[in-house]
């Protein structure tokens, strides 16, 4: 991609962020759900869930982070589908900007949105008893890894948003895919007691690896709660980065190609 793509992309990203400023409900509702999950699991279910060797709340919060940024990526697909439906993409075609810039701006603005959501969730987590036990560089690496994974997922959602006819379909399709992925994982409970088949799926689920990587980097881990024998969870940072690279390599070209088709309809 040339430098012009990123300059134009920054302009598109600013346009998307201004929309959040003008309609703050978008940010409010994107944070209400994870806050409710934190409060529900911390105060209602948390007393019934035992994580060997550590506080359940410290085990839980990184999982909520992972779930939230992944669900937040659906905004990318829904936003693009909405722009197509309202004819905004046709207006972009008339401007002297790179076609790829629309996608770069859309995914970039959603990273900023995820940063805001993570900040709000972190404050909520600190209130309910979550603590970062690692060093500052490790904690920053944990947040960056979560954002990198969310950025990769946003390109999948961008491709989906350019394929389907409306934002509603994007939301329904992404819910059907992402919801099972975030629950057949170690987001809320360790996978040690899962049935054999589900345990194998959960251990190699990239959602589990990004969650475990975040726990490691935040210092929210316990040897007793770790899953032995699964390379993906013994080296979650590498496994997650591998998924990020593969997703970007595959879905950036697919999304750009699909955008060109959508823009030429």
Mark where each language-model region is:
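Transmembrane helix-loop junction
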Residues: 42-47, 82, 91, 126, ...
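Hydrophobic alpha-helical transmembrane segments of multi-pass membrane transport proteins
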Residues: 36-41, 57-128, 149, 157, ...
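Aromatic- and glycine-rich beta-strand/loop motifs that create alpha-glucan
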Residues: 1-33
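Short hydrophobic, aromatic-rich alpha-helical segments embedded in or entering the lipid bilayer
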Residues: 6-12, 183-229, 237-238
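Alpha-helical transmembrane segments of multi-pass membrane transporters/translocases
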Residues: 38, 42, 215-265
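Pore- or pathway-lining transmembrane helices of multi-pass membrane proteins that form conduits
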Residues: 28-32, 166-186
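Alpha-helical transmembrane segments and their short interhelical loops
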Residues: 99-174, 235-255
């Amino acid at each position: 991609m040339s430098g012009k793509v990123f300059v134009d992309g920054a302009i598109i990203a600013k346009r998307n962020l201004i929309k959040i400023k003008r309609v703050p409900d978008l940010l409010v509702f994107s944070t209400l759900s994870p806050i409710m999950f934190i409060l529900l699991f911390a105060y209602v279910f948390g007393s019934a869930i035992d994580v060997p060797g550590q506080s359940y709340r410290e085990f839980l919060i990184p999982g909520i982070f992972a779930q939230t940024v992944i669900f937040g990526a659906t905004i990318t697909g829904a936003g693009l589908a909405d722009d197509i439906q309202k004819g905004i993409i046709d207006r972009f075609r008339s401007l002297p900007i790179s076609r790829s810039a629309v996608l770069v701006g859309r995914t970039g603005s959603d990273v900023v949105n995820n940063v805001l959501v993570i900040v709000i969730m972190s404050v909520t987590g600190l209130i309910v008893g979550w603590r970062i036990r690692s060093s500052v560089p490790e904690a920053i690496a944990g947040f960056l890894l979560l954002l990198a994974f969310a950025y990769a997922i946003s390109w999948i959602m961008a491709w989906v948003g350019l394929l389907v006819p409306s934002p509603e379909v994007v939301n329904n399709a992404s819910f059907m895919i992402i919801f099972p992925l975030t629950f057949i994982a170690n987001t809320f409970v360790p996978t040690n007691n899962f049935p054999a088949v589900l345990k194998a799926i959960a251990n190699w689920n990239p959602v589990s690896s990004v969650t475990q990587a975040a726990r490691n980097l935040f210092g929210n881990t316990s040897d007793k709660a770790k899953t032995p024998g699964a390379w993906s969870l013994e080296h979650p940072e590498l496994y997650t980065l591998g998924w990020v690279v593969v997703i970007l390599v595959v879905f950036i070209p697919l999304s750009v190609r699909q955008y060109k088709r959508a823009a030429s309809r």
